[in-house]
Amino acid sequence: MNKRDFLKNSAKIAAATSLSFSGIRAVQAQAHQGYQVLNPPVNTRASDKVEVLEYFWFGCPHCFAFEPSINKWADEKPDYVDFVREAPPLNPGWEPHSRAFYAAEIMGVTDKFFDPMFDGIHVERRSLRQPDKIAKFAGELGIDEDKFRKTMDSFAVNTRMKQAMQMAQASRIRGVPSVVINGKYLTGGSLAGSHDGIIRVINERVAEEYALL
């Protein structure tokens, strides 16, 4: 190798090293700010709104503890923000609760079912792990028990669970609660440090995304 080639190769290595360190610094900066950039971004439901998507599990105590913060935020959010939830069965033991969430969604009874299900598990300490017990619980809430049981085991619920898992994998969801802002930014307790930190990240990223609509 002559001197000219050596210098050219050295320059390329230096440039590549610089880019590598720049990438590391960018990731570190994102983590310090409480979020991670999703690259590539994940598709959202509507292009004319900023989507905020929470991933959760009914059996998760951290999700239950986060509910007052995210509910307060949802009550006060601007009209241009679309808030949605997904309950993918990231662990096989989560499946009955995922089925319950999507059954309630498909039957149009989420408002009747969502908060009582959380309270039943975490406040009343009820054992709501088996489909039959969950369906019976739904019946106590004035929901058609038999229909709820059948819907939990339906093709429609299977499809929604599969979609939720695909979305979670694309969004690099490893635990809950996790929040994805407009398919581009991932945050959660481990990244933002606290419930208030998660809400701060949501508000900052929403404002930035709204400016791009």
Question: PLM features: residue spans?
Answer:
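Structural microenvironment flanking redox-active thiols in thiol-disulfide oxidoreductases
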Residues: 76-107, 111-138
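Sec/Tat-exported extracytoplasmic proteins
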Residues: 59, 74-77, 104-108, 117, ...
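Extracytoplasmic/secreted proteins, especially bacterial periplasmic and envelope-associated proteins
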Residues: 51-54, 65, 69-72, 95-99, ...
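A short alpha-helix capping/helix-coil boundary motif
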Residues: 50-51, 78-81, 112-115, 142-145, ...
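Solvent-exposed loop/turn segments at secondary-structure junctions
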Residues: 59-62, 89-93, 119-123, 157, ...
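Extracytoplasmic thiol/disulfide redox context detector
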Residues: 2-92, 207-213
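C-terminal cap of thioredoxin/glutaredoxin-like
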Residues: 5, 140-213
